[in-house]
């Protein structure tokens, strides 16, 4: 009550924020006549003028009115679109590092150009982040015309680009791309071996389109770069055969749909043990014996695959592969795989080829990636429902931007039925009724399965319609273009919710593009375009009179934002429209989360088959259920962030140290320091402090010095000398080690040794970091059990992660020291037969292997150089026969400096440099 009274008297916080921005709008509008009087060349020169003024000390805020006026005029001339006043406010919100909530059809893409242009003037780059590759390409293509007119460059990051193309795109003033591509490029850059090979510049400003989808919906899913692990496909198949039998029996597992978890009952544990033993999968002993721990893991993942994941809802099988379906967009997520063996369990369930498991090499969550940007802003049609999360996690305020024209859409109360069959029958009845009026209809479903079920009903009734889901995603553009035509019926999964604009009468641009594809004659193209424009304008009037787009939702989603996205397809830019949701007691949201009393109360009302209940009370009850789900998901994301923050600080430290090593030409000082630390640790481990020589473990120390430092020293004789202590031993060992290193450097030459030192440090750093990530994954999976011992899992995780990180650094020092002490030059490669090998081109990055929350392929591990010890014995690799005369030392050193490791060797052997003469470096 008091809150409502305060809002009435003083306005909401959003109102006060808008007023502050609205005061600047007249200032921008006042500049319009003068800017319109400028020639194209004078308008373009304004960009140069703004840059010069920035260099002299002016601020971006100071330039804002003029820059916005220039961008607005350029847009009017080049794109034929002039920014409305409310769009100017949206641009100011984005520039301020906030989130602009703008209704569908209000021109978010155009709004972004204002903030993008202003912030690109600094020359530090602006990243515009979209949810898929199609939107990245489309927006970059459409808006590059504007930016080019203003003298700015535009790049776009999409899959399958080379490093050179990526570097060029990031060097542009404005770079478009998806959240996945930006994130993976960051991880890949931090796996490179030279600063020159990195593609990204230091971060400056990111503007995230559909910010709620990327920063909220996908926040819990980490980006992971991975390499191959052990193959256990046979075990997955054997366990799957057992679980198929198991799930058909009663009382063998407990399933919690709220938490999406499943556990074996005591009876189930005994039963699975019997089935595994019969199948010959279980080794001696019980299921939970230590040597069967891998089998337990496989059983758990197979059980999840069979009980929690449904084909055509959570994933589809396409071309013999299991492809994940994004629960928020309904789109296929090609290249992404579930981690921790779950994807392999699904492949076994569907009897397709089981891909190899992978091991994490590098990972980061979107939460931590986007917090790397000094300035972050975003835009979406639905953000206010998650305003608290944006503020708490990202320190971003949400500002609701008013529409340019009032919203005329009529939102009808939900209709709730007893069963799903009754619900879909009622939906079909309404579709038939509305279709006869000529009003276009968009029907939203939550899965492929349900969209095809409704399509089957409409087909039986002879009602023409289009289906848009992950199976028909190739036809998306043309289906969406026609969705606003008179009488059009479109059944869509959530994929129609984002990045699409359904215009009444049809989308002229999309229809023209589809109709003129392959037509080269300009006159013919113009004729086709004129005909389409005339038809669409006629259809627009017809649909407008019929009542606009009618949106029908067949189920409430867990998130109110997804429902609002669907509603928002209708009533764009002041158009008329309607929306209505049809629900049943069998819907997941009501069945799992809504009050149990709802079903009982409806049944007590004595509803007959086919009857529905419509009441605002039901809407409120459903909204409460959605809020509970959203709060639960928020808590889960916060919890994920707390754990990831532990590694995030370590990741920043590791990547910063690694970049420092890459930027340093001479690492001999670092090598010497690591060696000194290693020697001190060795001596202190074998010589107790302030002890007599008799208590020294000289034999153990001698063996370790020989193993790690490759030195045979008379340490036992030193111990007999008067006055000898641990410090004296350290000094002597260090002197001998330094002498040996100097001899190796003299033998190989200082320049070559510097290259080898850098290679050793970076490859060792990567190896120990990879092993640390694997250990951290294992720790994270089991840390929750500490709660049963009355200990805080998060604190336990922090303590153990710190201990593991310290141990990782110690391990790195020992490995680098051991490798450098055993390095030796090889005059020429051994004479193995020439083997024909395929090359992937001169790119160091493993392309196409990246996924969210899992991996999609193999990454070859860095190959050790000649004479290097490796963590595990490796079979000898085929080596080339040198062709022609061997290069001289000067040529070799030039090759080492200029030739990428994965490029073909300049000697002409046909092998990669790293497998040929690059073996020496």
UniProtKB/Swiss-Prot annotation:
GO terms for biological process: intracellular protein transmembrane transport; protein import; protein targeting; protein transport by the Sec complex. It comes from the Bacteria. May bind 1 zinc ion per subunit. ATP binds at residues 87, 105-109, 501. This is Protein translocase subunit SecA. The gene is secA. Its cofactor is Zn(2+). Belongs to the SecA family. GO terms for cellular component: cell envelope Sec protein transport complex; cytosol; plasma membrane. It is an enzyme of class 7 (translocase). It catalyses: ATP + H2O + cellular proteinSide 1 = ADP + phosphate + cellular proteinSide 2.
């Amino acid at each position: 009550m008091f809150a409502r009274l305060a809002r009435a008297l003083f306005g909401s916080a959003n109102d006060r924020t808008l007023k502050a921005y609205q005061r600047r709008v007249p200032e921008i509008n006042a500049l319009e006549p003068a800017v319109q009087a400028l020639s194209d060349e004078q308008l373009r020169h304004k960009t140069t003028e703004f840059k010069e003024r920035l260099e002299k000390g002016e601020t971006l805020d100071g330039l804002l009115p003029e820059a916005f006026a220039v961008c607005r005029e350029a847009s009017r001339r080049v794109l034929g679109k002039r920014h409305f006043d409310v769009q100017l406010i949206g641009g100011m919100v984005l520039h301020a590092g906030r989130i602009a909530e703008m209704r569908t059809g209000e021109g978010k893409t155009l709004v972004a150009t204002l903030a993008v242009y202003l912030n690109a003037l600094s020359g530090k780059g602006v990243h515009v982040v979209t949810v898929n590759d199609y939107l990245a390409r489309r927006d970059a293509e459409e808006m590059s015309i504007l930016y080019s007119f203003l003298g700015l460059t535009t790049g776009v990051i999409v899959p399958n680009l080379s490093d050179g193309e990526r570097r060029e795109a990031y060097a542009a003033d404005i770079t478009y791309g998806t959240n996945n591509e930006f994130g993976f490029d960051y991880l890949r850059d931090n796996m490179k071996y030279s600063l020159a090979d990195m593609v990204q510049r230091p971060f400056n400003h990111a503007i995230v389109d559909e910010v709620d989808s990327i920063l909220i919906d996908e926040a819990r899913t980490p980006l992971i770069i991975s390499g191959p692990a052990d193959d256990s496909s046979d075990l997955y198949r054997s366990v799957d055969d057992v679980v198929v039998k198991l799930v058909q029996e009663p009382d063998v597992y407990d399933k919690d749909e709220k938490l999406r978890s499943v556990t074996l009952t005591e009876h189930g544990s005994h039963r699975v043990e019997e089935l595994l033993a019969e199948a010959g999968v279980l080794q001696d002993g019980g299921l939970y014996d230590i040597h069967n721990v891998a089998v337990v893991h496989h059983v758990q993942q197979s059980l999840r695959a069979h009980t929690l994941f449904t084909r055509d809802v959570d994933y589809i099988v396409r071309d013999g592969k299991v492809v994940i379906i994004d629960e928020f967009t309904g789109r296929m997520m090609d290249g992404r795989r579930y981690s921790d063996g779950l994807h392999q369990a699904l492949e076994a369930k569907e009897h397709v080829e089981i891909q190899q498991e992978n091991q994490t090499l590098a990972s980061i969550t979107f939460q931590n990636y986007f917090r790397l940007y000094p300035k972050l802003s975003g835009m979406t049609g639905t953000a206010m429902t998650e305003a608290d999360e944006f503020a708490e996690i990202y320190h971003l305020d949400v500002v609701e931007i008013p529409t340019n024209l009032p919203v005329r859409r009529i939102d009808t109360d939900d209709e709730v039925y007893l069963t799903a069959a009754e619900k879909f029958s009622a939906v079909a009845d309404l579709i038939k009724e509305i279709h006869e009026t000529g009003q276009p209809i968009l029907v939203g479903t939550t899965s492929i399965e349900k969209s095809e079920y409704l399509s089957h009903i409409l087909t039986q009734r002879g009602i023409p319609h289009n289906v848009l889901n992950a199976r028909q995603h190739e036809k998306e553009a043309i289906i969406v273009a026609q969705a606003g035509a008179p009488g059009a019926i479109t059944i869509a999964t959530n994929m129609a919710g984002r990045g699409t604009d359904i215009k009444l009468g049809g989308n002229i641009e999309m229809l023209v593009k589809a109709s003129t594809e392959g037509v080269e004659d300009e006159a013919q193209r113009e004729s086709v375009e004129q005909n389409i424009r005339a038809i669409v304008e006629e259809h627009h009037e017809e649909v407008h009179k019929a009542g606009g787009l009618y949106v029908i939702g067949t189920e409430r989603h867990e998130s109110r934002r997804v429902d609002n996205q669907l509603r928002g397809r209708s009533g764009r830019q002041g158009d008329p429209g309607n929306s209505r949701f049809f629900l049943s007691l069998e819907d997941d949201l009501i069945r799992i989360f809504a009050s149990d009393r709802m079903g009982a109360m409806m049944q007590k009302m004595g509803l007959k088959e086919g009857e529905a209940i419509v009441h605002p009370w039901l809407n409120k009850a459903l909204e409460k259920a959605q809020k509970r789900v959203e709060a639960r998901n928020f808590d889960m994301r916060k919890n994920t962030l707390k754990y990831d923050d532990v590694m995030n600080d370590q990741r920043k430290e590791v990547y910063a140290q690694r970049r420092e090593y890459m930027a340093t030409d001479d690492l001999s000082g670092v090598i010497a320091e690591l060696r000194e630390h290693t020697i001190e640790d060795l001596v202190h481990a074998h010589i107790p402090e302030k002890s007599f020589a008799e208590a020294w473990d000289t034999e153990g120390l001698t063996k370790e010095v020989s193993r790690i430092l490759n030195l045979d020293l008379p340490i036992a004789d030193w111990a007999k000398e008067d006055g000898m202590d641990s410090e004296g031993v350290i000094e002597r060992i260090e002197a001998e080690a330094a002498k040996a290193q100097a001899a190796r450097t003299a033998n190989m030459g200082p320049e070559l040794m510097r290259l080898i030192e850098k290679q050793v440090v970076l490859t060792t750093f990567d190896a120990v970091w990879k092993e640390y990530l694997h250990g951290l994954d294992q720790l994270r999976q089991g840390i929750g059990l500490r709660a049963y011992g009355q200990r805080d899992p998060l604190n336990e995780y922090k303590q153990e992660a710190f201990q593991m990180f310290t141990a990782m650094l110690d391990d790195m020092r020992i490995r680098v020291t051991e490798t450098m002490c055993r390095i030796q030059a090889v005059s020429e490669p051994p004479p193995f037969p020439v083997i024909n090998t395929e090359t992937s081109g001169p790119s160091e990055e493993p392309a196409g292997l990246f996924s969210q929350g899992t991996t999609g392929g193999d990454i070859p591990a860095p190959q050790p150089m000649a004479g290097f010890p490796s963590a595990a014995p490796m079979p000898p690799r085929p080596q080339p026969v040198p062709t022609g005369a061997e290069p001289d030392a000067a040529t070799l050193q030039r090759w080492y400096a200029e030739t990428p490791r994965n490029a073909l060797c300049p000697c002409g052997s046909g092998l990669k440099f790293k497998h040929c003469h690059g073996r020496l470096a």
